[in-house]
């Protein structure tokens, strides 16, 4: 058995695993690398794949070539998904950074997305605290803290009351 034939099963297992992972949802390249490097849980506990670094690179390249792995598509879908769940731009940026997406790619996608963050912040505040929003200082501070935790920028939060007064 030659070395190239002995590496073939490891590459095939890695490729199969990558396609299965990417079939569930989009992943960033760094996420996919981390998941591929993790041991597989078998019947007798964790099993290591005896794949080389070259096998990992070939699998990642194959996924890019065939459209299974695309960081720009992942970023756009991630921003849309997290904003629908009520998270603001600061939190989304932080989560994308944790997933290995570059700051430039994140900023580009944030500029291209058509999301009104102020309206989204207002929707989150009214969903949690009711309509009309409280004007008492102590209640405004609670709402502000809640929205900051959700990742909204201070200027968007202040615009809620500025627009509310108009």
From Swiss-Prot:
BP terms from Gene Ontology = regulation of DNA repair
Q: Which domain of life is it from?
A: Bacteria
GO CC, sorted alphabetically, is: cytoplasm
- Database matches in InterPro entries: RecX_HTH_1st, RecX_HTH_2nd, RecX_HTH_3rd, Regulatory_RecX, WH-like_DNA-bd_sf
**UniProt xrefs under Pfam families:** RecX_HTH1, RecX_HTH2, RecX_HTH3
NCBIfam families (alphabetical): PRK00117.1-1 (NF001052)
Q: What is this protein called?
A: Regulatory protein RecX
Native organism taxonomy? Bacteria, Pseudomonadati, Pseudomonadota, Gammaproteobacteria, Enterobacterales
């Amino acid at each position: 058995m030659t070395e190239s034939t002995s590496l073939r099963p490891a590459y095939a297992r890695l490729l199969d695993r990558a396609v299965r992972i990417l079939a569930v949802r989009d992943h960033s390249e760094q996420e996919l690398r981390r998941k591929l490097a993790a041991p597989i849980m078998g019947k007798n506990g964790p099993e290591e794949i005896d794949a080389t670094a070259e096998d990992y690179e070939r699998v990642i390249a194959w996924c890019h070539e065939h459209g299974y792995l695309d960081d720009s598509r992942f970023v756009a879908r991630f921003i849309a998904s997290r904003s629908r769940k009520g998270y603001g731009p600061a939190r989304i940026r932080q989560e994308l950074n944790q997933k290995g997406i570059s700051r430039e790619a994140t900023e580009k996608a944030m500029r291209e997305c058509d999301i009104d963050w102020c309206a989204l912040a207002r929707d989150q505040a009214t969903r949690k605290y009711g309509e009309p929003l409280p004007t008492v200082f102590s209640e405004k501070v609670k709402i502000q803290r809640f929205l900051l935790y959700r990742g909204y920028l201070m200027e968007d939060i202040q615009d809620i009351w500025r627009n509310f007064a108009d």
